[in-house]
């Protein structure tokens, strides 16, 4: 696992909502609320020991702020016995009937040393370690970061991608790196959200992340401003070689060319 402070005791906040509160009903049973579904899910929440959910995050549903929203689940900040965690809530309209598949894929990532650790799960919920930090795009737009910090974050992110390639787990969404990499206050990087992952596709974690970091999009634009990347053709050639043979030597070649 990545070296960052993930689970810790917390003080009392005004946005800390007891799980019994009716204000959480539309989040717990999002997007189609029924009394029966809500009641069943509340029992699951009790069994998992979840005490509070926080209204905090960059996404809003009604008056509730949450950490994220995807096609399969919502993510909220939660508390279990005075410890912060992340809680994934399966959407009532999700194509998947349980969270089992995602848990299995997430565990493969964890076995490779990637991603926040899974703490517990049930049919409709997954509890993981909480990553306290900024999305990589918000982090890199900070005017106070220096080239060495950027190199370290890129190296860490790409190393994790290489580990996923070697574990034969394709994340599936690393071409949209800004939504799936969080950088902590200590500049530790964490790849999150494995709901689109697969062991059946050819892995392209390194090449997808490199595209976002070095070649196209807002993150790469800022990286280039700070590090003055080499010619695109050199990076593209190295990525093509790696795509044919995902060896350590070919990975190191990408990094030596890109992050000088």
Give residue ranges: language-model regions:
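A conserved alpha-helical element in kinase catalytic cores
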Residues: 89-122, 152, 213
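Protein kinase catalytic-loop region centered on the HRD/HxD motif
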Residues: 161-172
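Hydrophobic residue at the +6 position relative to the catalytic HRD Asp in the kinase catalytic loop
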Residues: 178-183
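Juxta-kinase regulatory segment immediately upstream of eukaryotic protein kinase catalytic domains
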Residues: 2-64, 254-259
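ATP-binding glycine-rich loop module of kinase domains
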Residues: 39, 47-100, 107
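C-lobe/activation-segment region of protein kinase-like
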Residues: 173, 184-260
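Conserved structural core of kinase catalytic domains
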Residues: 114-155
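Catalytic phosphate/metal-binding cores of nucleic-acid and nucleotide-processing enzymes, i.e., regions
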Residues: 90-92, 158, 162, 176
């Amino acid at each position: 696992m990545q070296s960052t402070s993930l689970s810790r005791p917390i003080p009392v906040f005004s946005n800390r909502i007891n799980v019994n509160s009716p204000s959480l009903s539309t989040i717990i049973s999002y997007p189609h609320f029924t009394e029966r579904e809500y009641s069943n899910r509340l029992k699951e929440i009790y069994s998992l020991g979840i005490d509070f959910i926080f209204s905090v995050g960059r996404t809003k549903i009604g008056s509730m702020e949450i950490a994220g929203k995807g096609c399969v689940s919502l993510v909220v900040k939660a508390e279990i016995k005075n410890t912060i965690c992340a809680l994934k809530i399966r959407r009532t309209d999700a194509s998947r009937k349980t969270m089992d598949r995602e848990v299995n894929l997430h565990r493969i990532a964890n076995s490779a040393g990637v991603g926040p650790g899974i703490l517990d799960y049930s049919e409709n919920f997954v509890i993981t370690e909480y990553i306290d930090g900024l999305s990589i795009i918000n982090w890199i737009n900070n005017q106070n970061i220096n080239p060495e910090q950027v190199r370290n974050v890129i190296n860490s992110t790409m190393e994790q991608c290489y580990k996923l390639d070697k574990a034969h787990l394709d994340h599936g969404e690393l071409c949209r790196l800004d939504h799936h990499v969080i950088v902590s206050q200590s500049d530790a990087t964490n790849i999150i959200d494995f709901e689109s992952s697969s062991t059946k596709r050819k892995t392209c974690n390194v090449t997808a992340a490199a595209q976002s970091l070095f070649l196209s999009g807002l993150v790469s634009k800022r990286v280039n401003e700070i590090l003055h990347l080499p010619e695109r053709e050199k990076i593209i050639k190295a990525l093509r070689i790696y795509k044919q043979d995902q060896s350590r030597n070919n990975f190191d070649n990408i990094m030596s060319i890109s992050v000088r």
